[in-house]
Amino acid sequence: MKHSEGFLRLVNDAKTRVKQIDVAGYLALRASGAPHLLVDTREESEWAAGHVAGAIHLGKGIIERDIETRVPDHAATLVLYCGGGYRSALVADNLQKMGYTSAISLDGGWRALKESGVELE
């Protein structure tokens, strides 16, 4: 999908402020046993079509409204993914503004996760 210039400017600006992790880094985090939550920020229809086993779903349209109910610990490590790493960067930026100190955007998103061989549902 080709993204608009305005959207890419917004995403690139957010990426200057957020921590990102690639799939290899996420798999290492997961293998280490370090506590974290994997959060799928895609739309409901994307989630229903398939997602990473064990992930929770909080779509980009509602995550800021619902995150504090679902994850009240602002120090929790949140690894956020979307389709390719754009929307998750925007979400990570907003969560940091809300006081979440370890919101991480997964670069490559769902596409990279599928290619990695992680268990899907």
Segments and roles (model prediction):
Residues 1-37, 41-77, 83-121:
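Rhodanese-like catalytic fold shared by cysteine-dependent sulfurtransferases
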